[in-house]
Amino acid sequence: MVHIGPIHRKEYDLEADRSEAVVIAEAPGRVHYLGEHGEPKAGLFLSSAINRRVQLAVSARKDNSLRFYAADSEERKRTSLANLKYKREDRWANYIKVAIYLFVELGCPVKGLNFSLWGNIPQHVSLASSQAIEIAAAVALRELFKVPLDDRTLVSALLAAQKGFFGKSNPPIDYLIALYALENCFVLADETTMEVTPIASILSDYTILLTDSRVPRAGVEEELRERRRAIRKGLEILGSKKQRASLREAAVADLTDLAGILPENIRRRNTHIIQELRRVRDAQEALAGTDPQALAKTILHSHENLRDLYEVSCPEVDWLVKRAQEIDGVLGSRMTGQGFGGCTYTIIRESAVEEYTRRLDDYERIFGFHPVIYRVRLGSGARLLRE
């Protein structure tokens, strides 16, 4: 793996002066295995960090300039503290800038800064690459400025900074997973309590393959907004007719009772969420009980619901999942992330990987997209690195 420290010193001519402190942090990407489409602020996720990560190095400057270098693409961006604002053309650098904004808002004596970034998290496939940059930058700057913020307070401050910098904030779960994940563990992440509970993996005999379908994802945001509206409307009706404050309190039978009131699309969307909440708990029990076959059934049923009820899959992704499930040695396969393309994950024995890879030749012939496979492991959370 690349180490960003020497690259940073070379980029900013710091190789001769070792007295100039360079702080380095890394943060992981993540995979949601179950639960990523849920009730806003009340979701329940089975997730993990992965060993695909970003590394970020930062050092102080003597002026008020802000310099950014992406080592993997050799891109450079620059701005100043006086001009610290979102710029669309700055793309990846905006995720570092929001962390700078965080510490400016906290009243830290921020001066000019040099940043270098390297990462191997696949982008635009719902693996939290941008959140990893934000967390790595926030952790590095916390250390550089010696600010006594615990991880939860850091996440709260980062969400507030996002609102000020971007005009909106992300859900906190991805940041909590990035900070609290443990090696070789899944995590149960609960949005209502902000608790992230590690669950030891029982899959030492398996590897995890992420397959990028390469399907273009135009128009995804409006489709997702429609589903969020359906969840809100379902909650409104369940609240008034069944006194349910949350989908966690609801049952599929409640939706059946309201069949004459609920439009069909709202019934389907909310049915998926209610059943998915149960599936996350079932998966937790399967992992605790060392029952991989029960986990496999849960994964299969989840994808079927995402396809048929929540309707965020697509033919290409369904093909990948179906073909994977046909292979002896595959425990489970499912779409992950926002949907309408993106990635699948496949939990597979090493002996079956060659057969899986061979079947992807048919995918390209049928759909015209060249899929990309990433082999990943359950990874640890964000941390500081020695230079």
Where are these regions (language model features)?
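C-terminal nucleotide
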Residues: 2-34, 55-94, 109, 185-332, ...
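Short Gly/aromatic-enriched secondary-structure transition segments
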Residues: 42-49, 227-228
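A structural signal for short, well-ordered beta-strand segments
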Residues: 115-117, 211-213, 344
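Amphipathic alpha-helical interaction elements
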Residues: 126, 143-146, 216, 345, ...
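FabD-like malonyl-/acyl-CoA
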Residues: 131-132, 343-347
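Glycine-rich phosphate-binding loop
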Residues: 340
